[in-house]
């Protein structure tokens, strides 16, 4: 057959792309590299910040295990089962992230007082309302028929993502809108957005195939890994403010 007359779907598959195994090993390897850098940096942090930084590292380790579960090489099928296991692992990871954010941000907001302190729970309420609306509009239809995912994704979104986003905003405000705190804020926003994209695309209209398409993995990874790297600056931001200024 003349290549020019090949069906469009065959022509689209012709460009070479990385083997699936290589792609996922690269993905997991990068997460392990960031974890290694964070562990090595522990010695540069003050003891108080290092204690909480270790909690964040444990959280990222859970997220890395979640990445393995979500990968196409995990052998966990179909997608609904894969995501059900991932909800638990990422729930632990991001729950730890949110706890440390709260520990860093809340005392500083309290010491500043003023509008930021008075409005802190209003921020949480607004984020919770927005998250709930997003789940209803974009996620609910995808997870219908999968009871654990339906309940789990709703609670995950309402509680953990509300806390992660809200406390990232708190921290940005408490750190006087610094560039390092901006990195943390963007990271705290990208991580939930990546999972919103994941649920919306991996289970479209209730379809439950075995493995997501390569493009869906790649697009989710850009958001997710970018968020993880930016959020990793949280201990650095906190430590730079807790140390006495040199004269």
At which residue positions do the language-model features occur?
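Polytopic alpha-helical membrane-helix bundles and their juxtamembrane interface segments
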Residues: 1-247
């Amino acid at each position: 057959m003349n290549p020019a007359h090949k069906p469009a779907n065959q022509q689209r598959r012709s460009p070479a792309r990385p083997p699936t195994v290589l792609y996922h090993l690269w993905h997991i390897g990068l997460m392990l590299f960031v974890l290694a850098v964070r562990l090595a940096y522990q010695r540069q942090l003050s003891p108080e910040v290092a204690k909480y930084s270790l909690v964040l590292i444990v959280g990222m380790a859970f997220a890395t295990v979640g990445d393995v579960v979500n990968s196409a090489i995990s052998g966990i099928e179909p997608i609904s089962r894969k995501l059900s296991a991932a909800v638990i692992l990422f729930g632990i990871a991001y729950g730890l992230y949110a706890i440390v954010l709260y520990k860093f941000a809340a005392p500083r907001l309290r010491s500043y007082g003023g509008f930021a302190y008075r409005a802190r729970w209003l921020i949480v309420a607004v984020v919770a309302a927005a998250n709930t609306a997003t789940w209803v509009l974009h996620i609910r239809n995808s997870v219908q028929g999968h009871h654990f995912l339906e309940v789990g994704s709703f609670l995950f979104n309402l509680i953990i993502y509300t806390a992660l986003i809200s406390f990232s905003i708190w921290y940005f405000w408490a750190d006087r809108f610094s560039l390092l705190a901006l990195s943390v804020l963007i990271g705290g926003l990208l991580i939930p957005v990546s999972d919103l994209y994941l649920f919306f695309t991996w289970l479209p209209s209730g379809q439950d195939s075995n493995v997501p398409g390569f493009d869906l993995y790649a697009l989710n990874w850009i958001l997710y890994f970018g968020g993880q790297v930016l959020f990793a600056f949280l201990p650095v931001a906190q430590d730079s403010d807790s140390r006495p200024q040199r004269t």
